[in-house]
A protein has these predicted regions:
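Short, mixed charged/polar active-site loops
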Residues: 19-23, 197-199, 287
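Electropositive, glycine-dotted interaction segments
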Residues: 16-159, 163
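Short, hydrophobic/aromatic-rich segments at coil-to-beta transitions
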Residues: 4-13
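C-terminal lobe/lid and adjacent interdomain/linker elements of RecA-like ASCE P-loop ATPase modules
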Residues: 243-306
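Phosphate-binding glycine-rich loops of NTP-binding sites
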Residues: 1, 17, 212-218, 264-267
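Short acidic, glycine-rich loop/turn motifs
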Residues: 13-17, 54, 191-195, 283
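Conserved ABC ATPase signature
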Residues: 154, 167-170, 174-220, 227, ...
């Protein structure tokens, strides 16, 4: 049931680990009261707070960098606050103040965040980037839209685990294989499927086949990230492909978070990798929460106050 808003509009994001923790608080700008300088950007969010600390829990003594509005302060080598800097309200201290000398911790966290990969929904329609021929360059990391699929697969074949790629394809499509050829400077994907007289081009693949090959390229990256997040990887896949997808996910060389609505995929993955944690989500007054987790079961966390 809806209620009257009692707090300021805002968006808070944060994470923590054994080494560092980071949190930010976005909010709306203070409306301009100057009639001579009106603005049309009153809904453009800005940073209200931004904090970086050592360890898993935010404590005043653990703070390494602290930002309130435009003012940012960082600790020096002795642990004392080294004055204050001012940055734009729409700029992050991670981008503006990360420096290997002044505050190396900001640089470490920034590069760690940059290495994380999130794959949400790959397009598989007729005009999808993954169906087009592209200029070939070494591609150790599949782009978020999958447009460099052919280059990513060829990079795995030449510089990565070619055997794992062949196995992932044959697990899903017995006696089939992928080939990448160069045509007038462009890389073109060819899919050799058992029973067909000629290979299929990317433009001819079914949505499910194309999407599976995209997951192969993402999960067998020669440059695995620290954190890889897949959102509903079962979309468009035939149910018979889910065991092969589960086996592919289980072999990933990264901390992996898979958001799925397909219980057969979850069950198949749990059977292959029993050490994987299964967390069920549910709605509670419009908010997404972990099922069965009470207040006492939540990890220790403190949001920085505005």
């Amino acid at each position: 049931q809806g209620t009257v808003r009692t707090k300021a509009v805002g968006l808070r994001l944060g994470f923590s680990g054994d080494e560092f923790g980071y949190a930010l608080d976005f909010g709306l700008p203070v409306p301009s009261s100057d009639p001579l300088r009106p603005t049309l950007f009153n809904l453009d969010p800005e940073f209200k707070r931004e904090c970086l600390w050592r360890g898993p829990v935010l404590r005043p003594a653990a703070l390494l960098a602290d930002r309130a509005g435009p003012a940012v302060r960082v600790r020096d080598d002795s642990g004392a606050w080294a004055g204050s800097s001012r940055i734009g309200l729409t700029d992050s201290m991670l981008s503006e103040l990360a420096d290997p000398r002044a505050c190396p911790e900001l640089l470490v966290v920034r590069e760690r965040l940059r290495s994380w990969r999130f794959y949400d929904q790959f397009r598989t329609d007729a005009d999808a980037p993954a169906r087009q021929d592209r200029i070939g360059t070494r591609t150790p990391v599949l782009d978020h839209d999958g447009g460099d699929l052919a280059a990513a697969l060829r990079t795995i074949q030449e510089f990565g685990d070619d055997e794992a790629l062949a196995e992932a394809v044959s697990d899903a499509f017995p006696r089939s294989r992928v080939e990448v050829e160069a045509v007038d400077g462009l890389l073109r994907l060819r899919f050799h499927q058992h029973g067909l007289l000629r290979p299929l081009a990317a433009a001819e693949l079914s949505d499910g086949t194309l999407r599976y090959l995209l997951w192969v390229a993402a999960l067998l990256s020669p440059r695995p990230p620290e954190l890889l997040v897949l959102n509903e990887p079962e979309t468009s896949l035939h149910p018979d492909l889910l065991p092969a997808l589960a086996a592919l996910i289980a072999k990933a060389r990264a901390q992996l978070i898979v958001v799925s609505h397909a219980r057969p995929l979850v069950h198949a993955l749990s059977a292959i990798a029993p050490e994987a944690a299964v967390l069920e989500l549910e709605k509670e007054f419009g908010a997404t929460v972990l099922a069965g987790q009470g207040r006492l079961g939540r990890p220790a966390w403190h949001w920085p106050k505005r």
